[in-house]
Amino acid sequence: MAAERGAGQQQSQEMMEVDRRVESEESGDEEGKKHSSGIVADLSEQSLKDGEERGEEDPEEEHELPVDMETINLDRDAEDVDLNHYRIGKIEGFEVLKKVKTLCLRQNLIKCIENLEELQSLRELDLYDNQIKKIENLEALTELEILDISFNLLRNIEGVDKVTQLKKLFLVNNKISKIENLSNLHQLQMLELGSNRIRAIENIDTLTNLESLFLGKNKITKLQNLDALTNLTVLSMQSNRLTKIEGLQNLVNLQELYLSHNGIEVIEGLENNNKLTMLDIASNRIKKIENISHLTEPQEFWMNDNLLESWSDLDELKGARSLETVYLERNPLQKDPQYRRKVMLALPSVRQIDATFVRF
């Protein structure tokens, strides 16, 4: 297949970006969030389960036979090369691509990152869904800005410290247990480590340009070591083991905060986060809406699946003049026969209550 530029490739690029946005939400909550939030913040439960099943496959059980690279005709002048699901077993023969900027090798049978030294103009490398166990041999890719090695078999973050121009790093659904070896990535804007085995937020204080941090579906017990990330606008921590909202005082530019599926009991610690437009605290153990009356920018408020009983708590949201979406279902107050009517009366700006739009 000749790898060519054009309308077809542009469409492929757009599909890759949509895929990557979805994987960036690896925190796994209600599918409705994908429709109501400005950026996709969660992977649907079914997609997450499918991904887990893929990620846990034993590569030794793989019955597909690798393709012979000599049967693939590469366009030497191509800037964008998409070889998604080609049964490629080894990275080889790509040295002819002197002009390539984007190389997509998704859903192949690759076990090792190798033979990329000649691709010095490469800016995006996509190795999503392969059988890679180690990040290595990237030193020559000095122009690389986007790297995706999600859904592989990685256990450590390594081999990226020399790729100092990286802006986006995706390592979703691996077996990583520690955040490390990222201190040289001063240009990094997005870091996605969802669905791993991480227990602590650490070793990210030099990532001062970071704008989006996704750590959903890990084993993190505490919000900490975030003080240096003053440019952070999106923080996603769903499906961890958090019990308290804390450590966010320096995140004055934070706009979207996702804390669903944890063990949080009290809304607190948001005194300095005045730019929040999205607050997701669904599926926790919270009994009361409090300590957020100073937030005037929220457009979405997710507090479904908690322990909210009192209608007077909704007064805490009246300062949010742009509030359009609230999720309060599966709280005790939903048992009220006038549930939707009372929400509308308390929050007249709201246009969507749970999954249903308000009719006037």
Curated annotation (Swiss-Prot):
Residues 331-360 form the LRRCT domain. One of its GO terms (cellular component) is nucleus. Gene3D superfamilies: Ribonuclease Inhibitor (3.80.10.10). It is found in: Nucleus. Keywords: Acetylation, Leucine-rich repeat, Nucleus, Phosphoprotein, Repeat. LRR repeats lie at residues 77-98, 99-120, 121-142, 143-164, 165-186, 187-208, 209-230, 231-252, 253-274, 275-296, 297-318. Residues 1-64 are annotated as: Disordered. Belongs to the SDS22 family. This is Protein phosphatase 1 regulatory subunit 7.
